[in-house]
Amino acid sequence: MYIKSFRQLIEENDRCLMVPCVYDCASARAVEIVGFESMMLSGGELSMAMNGIIEHDTSNFAECEWMAGRIARSSNIPLAVDIGDGWAKSPIAIYRECKRLAAIGVTAIQMEDASSYGILPEGAVLREGEGGGGCAQGYGLYLNCADQRGCGDHDGPVL
C-alpha cells in the first residue's frame, strides 16, 4: 500500500513532480531511500532491463506487467508505467491492459498518441475520458470505468 497515490501527490503539490525512472526492484528501492515521492517504469528502461538494448519493440506487455508488479509490491511510493502505444491494436485491448496494471498496483499510466503506429486516425486528439479510436478510445473506456467503480485503495490510475 502506498503512502500517497499519484492523485494525492498531484493535488497536494504546487510544483512539478520529479519522477525518476526505475527498471527493477533494486532501483525502485534506491529511489525510495533517497526520498523521491514517486517513480516510473519507462519503456526504454524496461527494454534495457529485459533485453540489454534500448529498443521499444523488443519488450511486450507481459514483460511490462511482470516487472511493474514486482516493482509495485517492493515499494511504498506510487509507480507510473509508460506503456507506449499499449502493445495492442484495439480499444478493448488497451482497456484490459490498463485494468490489469491497476490491479497489480500501478497508479499512473503514460500512453503515447499512437497515430504514427496507425492506431489513431491522423489528427486525433487524446483527451482524458474521451475516445477518438485506438488507444484514446481504450484509455477513455478505462477512465470511465475507473470513475464509475473506483479502483481500490490507490484511487485509480491517472494519466
Regions found by a protein language model. Name each.
Residues M1-L159:
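Alpha/beta enzyme core
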